[in-house]
Structures are given as structure tokens and as C-alpha cells.
């Protein structure tokens, strides 16, 4: 089985549980390999950069709303069906990464490890259930580490190098829209990016109501069900500010230039 870990995993399991040690610990308890979900986030970012510049900024499409948060996207589709076509059509990072893993490890199952209980419902969708076999929250994983007596102080780490800063930044509020806007600025410097974002479903509904009224034409809109982003998900273990700082540090450490060779 291969573990795909959401970007918000950083710092969740205590100060000794550095990213490289979490990867090693997952292998220690039985996973054959470990992949950053940030890899899939990067793929989605590139797709959305081109879509915004070619279709939204030109007026062909009304606006582009992110879709990686399942609680937000399901709410948008259910309560604002007339604008649901403006939600990003890119696969969510979980699904994009899982499909990649199934290609590189065809005989393995995939377990998504993250902060989000809504991902359990996403993984049950008919079009996704063959890609993601299991969903485990950080809280549940901590129980597995405890059951296996994992001591992060005694583990030798194994470095991660799957995701660019953009994908790793998806874990915090503003990170998704920020990644897309950064890509547009780099690849389409002549294009102005208009942005709006909301945290918490009540605020997300207000943002969508404004868009429905025609007041967000040409915008890039990010919705996050959890205030603070994925680092505030129901399956997390650390305070939001502490988790956000850890994610930002991990983001800055990425050696990958996502937009090198793009254009």
C-alpha cells in the first residue's frame, strides 16, 4: 500500500516528527512508499493557471472557483447549481496524486492521509473509489503510530522531494489562489488576476451569492470550509498558527520550480 500525505501533515505529530521522519515512520509501519499530495496540487495549479489566463481573463468564462476542498465544492454545487460550471474541473490533489500512484505502483492500494473528514465522502464517489482505497486522518494515524510504538527521536529520516512550494502551500487559507495567481504572473505577466476568497462555509456562501449576482466576473475565487484552511481540519492535532508556520517552512524548503519549462 502507498500512502499519499496531504500538505498539512507537517508538524502534526510533534516537534521530533520532521517531514522526513514522518515518511520513514509510515514505511516503518508497513507502507511501501509515501508520496506528497502536493504533487497533485501542483498539476492542478498548472491547469488552473492556463484556464484562468485563457478563458476567465478573456471573458470567455465568468470566473474560476477552486474545487480542492470537497466540503466547499459540494456546497457550491448543491446551493448554487447555476454557477457550478465555474468550479475548477481539475482533479483534486488527492485524486490526481492517487491516479499517478496507481500508474507507478499498479499492484498497490492507495491510502490518503490528511486532516479532512470530508475526504472520506469524496473517496466514496463512484468516479473516485477505484483511485483512493482508504482515507485516514492525522488523528487516526497518530493512533497507529502509538500502537506501533513509533519513536520519532529514534528514526532516521527519508527526504521528501515530490512537490513544489505551490502545492505544499495548499494547506493554508489563501494558498490555492496564491499558487494560481503566482503562476499567472509568471507565465502570463500581462494578465491581471482579480481574487476573492472565503473561509468557513457561511462566508463561502456569501461569496458565491455575490458571484451569482454578477459581481465577481473575471475573478479567481478560493473557498475553504475550515477557517484557516486544511491546517484547521477536524482530523488535525496541532494549533492552527503552529501548523501554518510548519507548512510555510516546508513550503520554503522545496527544491522544485513548478513553472520551469511551462509557457
Residue ranges of each PLM-predicted region?
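Iron-sulfur-associated redox domains of electron-transfer enzymes in respiratory
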Residues: 1-263
Amino acid at each position: 500500500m502507498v500512502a499519499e500525505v496531504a500538505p498539512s501533515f507537517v508538524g502534526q505529530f510533534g516537534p521530533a516528527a520532521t517531514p522526513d521522519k514522518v515518511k520513514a515512520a509510515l514505511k516503518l509501519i508497513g507502507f511501501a512508499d509515501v508520496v506528497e499530495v502536493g504533487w497533485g496540487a501542483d498539476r492542478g495549479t498548472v491547469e488552473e493557471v492556463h484556464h484562468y489566463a485563457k478563458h476567465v481573463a478573456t471573458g470567455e468564462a465568468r470566473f474560476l472557483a477552486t474545487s480542492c476542498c470537497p466540503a466547499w465544492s459540494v456546497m457550491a454545487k448543491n446551493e448554487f447549481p447555476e454557477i457550478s460550471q465555474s468550479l475548477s474541473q481539475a482533479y483534486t490533489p488527492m485524486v490526481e496524486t492517487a491516479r499517478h500512484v496507481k500508474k507507478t505502483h499498479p499492484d498497490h492500494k492507495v491510502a490518503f492521509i490528511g486532516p479532512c473528514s470530508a475526504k472520506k465522502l469524496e473517496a466514496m464517489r463512484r468516479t473516485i473509489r477505484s483511485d483512493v482505497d482508504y482515507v485516514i486522518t492525522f488523528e487516526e494515524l497518530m493512533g497507529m503510530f502509538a500502537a506501533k510504538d513509533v519513536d520519532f527521536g529514534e528514526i532516521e529520516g527519508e527526504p521528501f522531494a515530490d512537490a513544489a512550494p505551490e502545492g505544499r502551500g495548499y494547506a493554508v487559507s489563501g494558498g490555492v489562489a496564491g499558487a494560481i495567481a503566482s503562476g499567472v504572473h509568471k507565465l502570463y505577466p500581462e494578465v491581471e488576476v482579480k481574487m476573492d476568497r472565503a473561509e468557513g462555509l457561511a462566508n463561502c456562501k456569501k461569496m458565491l451569492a455575490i458571484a451569482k449576482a454578477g459581481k465577481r466576473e473575471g475573478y479567481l475565487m478560493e473557498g475553504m470550509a475550515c477557517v484557516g484552511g486544511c491546517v484547521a481540519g477536524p482530523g488535525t492535532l496541532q494549533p492552527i498558527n503552529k501548523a501554518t508556520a510548519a507548512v510555510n517552512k516546508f513550503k520554503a524548503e522545496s527544491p522544485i520550480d513548478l513553472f520551469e519549462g511551462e509557457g
